[in-house]
Amino acid sequence: MKVALSIVFLLIISTISFGQTTPPSESAMSRFLRYVKIDTQSAEDAGKFPSTEKQLVLARLLEKELKDLGVQNVRISQEGIVYGMIPGNLAANTKVPTIGFIAHMDTSPAVSGANVNAIIHKNYQGGDIVLPGDKTQVITVKQNPDLKNLIGDDIITADGTTLLGSDDKSGIAELMTMIDTLKQNPSIKHGNVAIAFTPDEEVGGPMDKFDIEGWGAKFAYTVDGEQLGDISNETWSARTATVTFTGRSTHPGTAKGIMINSSYAAGDFLSRFPAMIPNRPETTAGRVGFIHPYSTTMSEETSTIKILLRNFDITGLAGQEAAVKRVIAATQRKYPNVKIEYGSVLGYLNMKEVLKNYPQLTDYAIEAAKRAGISAQLRPIRGGTDGSRLTARGLPTPNLFTGGHNFHGKLEFNSRKGLEKSTETLVHLVQIWAERSK
């Protein structure tokens, strides 16, 4: 009899249609447009978390909104992480693991996120999109073929002078709308759902401080991906290298025979990359890793170049380090009087080595997307997420799509469909965990 009742229960909760639900009190698009107005750009090398105080403006807003939606145990940690828990509504004897969802509050330091002027291109009918604040910024169909799937949709961009902030305020808006939807529809059955919003994801933020035990999730998902349907259980393995050039400074008026200008050696080092380092971001795609000098500081006495090393294969990182050292050796031969030093730190490892042991995480996500009308596929991330580091710490955490495109640049965009379908997928996902668990 218990088995029969369980089957009936599962059939009931699996047949709830998202289209039959009571709508949330605020749409994902409306929330998104509010959140992008808040500048939350993080900063490299701040030496603290959060790296910028302005991230706490959004953290406090989310804290209030979570409490208003009835989320329990809402708190902001010393590092600026917002935590909360949505209690399950299943029978007491139903065993469903607590599932967590994470989105990050900061935007990339690469481009300004201040004074974002979001533009809604209603009922998009095809063609390139010229951004009105800087008409040299054009979202082209050639470089963005997914635009062909957005005919009739409302596309959201910035005006061409800033980031939009879709990375990752889309994820935040979608999670908040999921929470709202669950509140409005108690007939949607789910287990405990843990929520977290993190600072400084873009600059290697405080995931070593993330309170996994106190948060309570057994499995989690980051909501930090791009186009609809992209689900990721694989990221880069990542190191960050620093090359330091040390010369000798003196007053330029009396520098003859004395000054050793380190910036010349640093410039020579960079100039060798096109010939000696073929795999760079602008020359690679798919599963091919890259070496990327991304930050330089130069002076006569000391110059520093920071370099990203990225590879899906952990053993490939050693080869990339060797390649950088060959460039250093060539530069050293030309500038023997400049001291050149190399160092690197490990950022995160490809999470696939752990997640391959938990295929249900991505299987359930693919099924949830299917129920939302989205064809989903596993696609490796040419990047990293908070989930990379949480997975390494023992909390398996793949990544889900948000509908966004062109992260970290002025051509960033999302759409009404992207936001809504991502939200639907999240709602279906918590239902599926309730259905499939015993």
Describe each region flagged by the PLM.
Residues 17-21:
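Boundary at the C-terminal end of the N-terminal hydrophobic targeting segment
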Residues 25-53, 156-157, 249, 348, ...:
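N-terminal capping segment at the start of a domain
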Residues 28, 260-279, 315-330, 364-370, ...:
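His/Asp/Glu-rich mid-to-C-terminal helical/loop segments that flank catalytic regions of hydrolases
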Residues 147-236, 278-294, 305-312, 318, ...:
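Acidic/histidine-rich catalytic neighborhood of metal-dependent amide-processing enzymes
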